[in-house]
């Protein structure tokens, strides 16, 4: 997230317009532009914890992480710069929330890569603001308008659910596989045994599906779920509650806020950060697993078959096995066969 994205480069072409403005950045931020942006005041709201981590170092309390925006946090803002995400439902949710809090007359800028679907921005907000395209460069579009009417936002209106066997899965916009179980996760779930014991960590938990299924198969396992996405965190908590399942749900950038060791780590790790391809999270997941698994502990992940995870698994654990595969996905497992290095040092 160090280099500027094409969308941010387009914004910089208009940077002189913001010198005296009180700006709120929101949406699919992929770089540190807000930390170097010149304006009377700059604030950021993000649903992504790893984005908050980066920006918080430079901006402190002017960066807010959470599912929804705090009204007091944006009370003085007169300009919104919104980065369009790849999920249209996520954009609808975030804009409806933000535009319910900003005053009528607020300048609204929407920027995004054309492939993200940003061209539909004007239609999405036409009841609240008239957006006009004011720039096009780097395969991005920049739109501007003024808020004519505040939106009405009620979080309860955005919840959806679906049934998976005897489980009720609760989801919010922006959560992976919001409308049903994806093929990769289904393949991983097919490898889980019944009556396992110990502690399990579900990294990138989404709506909490995998951990919930595991709980039904092995009720004695102690569950910990983690994700960077605020919508996923709230969805997982709601899924556990709806099914009477006990578990701890933690906001964490892979292992950043995780302590202790586990008997099993499961994950369907992402290989995109927004629209950009990124293996960072998966590589961190694999390489950092030794510090969070006990002797005999297992890391079990599902991934697209073309991704280069076997080499990383072998370099980290010494070997791996393929538990299941289909035409697109493979389920890999690696086992800690000896005491992790940091444990040896303590002896």
UniProtKB/Swiss-Prot annotation:
GO terms for molecular function: 16S rRNA (guanine(1207)-N(2))-methyltransferase activity; nucleic acid binding. GO terms for cellular component: cytoplasm. Its EC number is 2.1.1.172. It comes from the Bacteria. It is found in: Cytoplasm. Monomer. It comes from Serratia proteamaculans (strain 568). Belongs to the methyltransferase superfamily. RsmC family. Its main location: cytoplasm. This is Ribosomal RNA small subunit methyltransferase C. Gene3D superfamilies: Vaccinia Virus protein VP39. SUPFAM superfamilies: S-adenosyl-L-methionine-dependent methyltransferases. Specifically methylates the guanine in position 1207 of 16S rRNA in the 30S particle. Pfam families: MTS (PF05175), MTS_N (PF08468). Keywords: Cytoplasm, Methyltransferase, rRNA processing, S-adenosyl-L-methionine, Transferase. The keyword Transferase applies. It catalyses: guanosine(1207) in 16S rRNA + S-adenosyl-L-methionine = N(2)-methylguanosine(1207) in 16S rRNA + S-adenosyl-L-homocysteine + H(+).
């Amino acid at each position: 997230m160090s280099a500027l994205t094409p969308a941010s480069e387009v914004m910089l072409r208009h940077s002189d317009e913001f010198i005296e403005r009180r700006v709120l950045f929101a949406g699919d931020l992929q770089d540190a532009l807000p930390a170097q942006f010149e304006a009377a005041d700059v604030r950021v709201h993000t649903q992504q914890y790893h984005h908050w981590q980066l920006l918080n170092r430079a901006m402190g309390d002017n960066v807010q992480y959470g599912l929804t925006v705090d009204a007091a946090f944006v009370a003085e803002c007169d300009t919104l710069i919104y980065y369009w995400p790849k999920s249209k439902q996520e954009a609808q949710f975030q804009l409806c929330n933000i535009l319910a809090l900003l005053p009528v007359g607020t300048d609204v800028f929407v920027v995004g890569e054309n492939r993200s679907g940003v061209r539909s921005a004007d239609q999405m907000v036409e009841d609240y603001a008239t957006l006009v395209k004011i720039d096009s460069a780097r395969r991005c579009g920049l739109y501007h308008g003024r808020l004519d009417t505040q939106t009405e936002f009620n979080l309860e209106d955005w919840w959806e659910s679906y049934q998976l066997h005897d489980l009720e899965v609760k989801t919010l916009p922006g959560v992976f596989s919001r409308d049903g179980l994806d093929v990769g996760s289904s393949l991983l779930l097919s490898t889980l045994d019944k009556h396992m014991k110990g502690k399990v960590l579900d990294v990138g938990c989404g709506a909490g599906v995998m951990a919930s299924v595991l709980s039904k198969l092995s009720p004695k396992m102690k569950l910990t779920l983690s994700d960077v996405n605020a919508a996923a965190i709230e969805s997982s908590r709601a899924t556990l509650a709806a099914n009477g399942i006990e578990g701890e749900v933690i906001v964490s950038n892979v292992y950043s806020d995780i302590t202790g060791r586990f008997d099993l780590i499961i994950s369907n790790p992402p290989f995109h950060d927004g629209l950009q391809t990124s293996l960072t999270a998966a590589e961190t997941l694999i390489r950092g697993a030794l510090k969070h698994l006990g002797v005999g502990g297992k890391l079990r992940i599902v991934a697209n078959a073309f991704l280069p995870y076997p080499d990383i698994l072998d370099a980290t654990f010494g070997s791996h096995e393929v538990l299941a595969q289909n035409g697109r996905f493979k389920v890999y497992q690696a086992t800690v066969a000896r005491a992790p290095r940091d444990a040896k040092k303590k002896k």
